Amino acid sequence: MKKIFFAAALAGAAMLASCGGNKSGVQMGSLSDFDSLSYSLGANIGYGMSYEMKDIPFDFKLVDKGIKEGAMGKASQEHDKSLDMLREYFMSKRGERAQAIAEKRAAADSVRLAGGDSTKVEYPAADPEMFESEEERAEISYAFGNDIGYNVAQSGMPIQLVWISEAMQNVRDNNAKMTEDEVNQYLQYYFMVKRPAENAEASK
């Protein structure tokens, strides 16, 4: 099944929100009652990150903080500033640092082989050197979360933030309550069936 990555999902949600006039549906929520939409969205974000950003050692506590504060309109950083930071990092710094790390590892492997050591070294997927400092790691992690939170709020969906956080953590821990296919199926149902029906009813 074709994957629905979170950026596309949120873009679709924002378009539907503009049609239906629902601009505010975000709340912190409670883990006492499972929320399929919020969990699916969080798992979708988590799965997307595990594929496309596994090389980046985010501070996930700050990502989570950014999501919640951004979604509730309480971010300590303007969304435009977060976007500028993310563009610079992902369009320039990320690629340069990934290349430098790959070259460094290749050189280390060559030295070992030259010394007669053929043992294969398993390098971590996310290298700390993807960030130049802990300060930059914190800034990018928060900005990334703030961008997600901002777009969640703009989507107008009835989202419980605790379930987004829970799902993202579950995906990282490899114990998600929904498989990737189940997540995709639910989001397709929500965007193509449930949400349009709700918007049509609201516009009467």
Locate the predicted segments by residue.
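Positively charged n-region of N-terminal signal peptides that target proteins for export
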Residues: 1-4
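C-terminal motif of bacterial Sec signal peptides marking the signal peptidase cleavage site
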Residues: 15-18
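Bacterial signal peptide processing site
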Residues: 20-23
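Post-signal-peptide N-terminal segment of Sec-exported extracytoplasmic proteins
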Residues: 30-73
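FKBP-type peptidyl-prolyl cis-trans isomerase
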Residues: 41-47, 66, 141-151, 167
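Compact alpha-helical subdomains of small soluble proteins
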Residues: 61-113, 163-204
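Extended amphipathic alpha-helical interaction segments
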Residues: 113-137, 143, 150, 154, ...
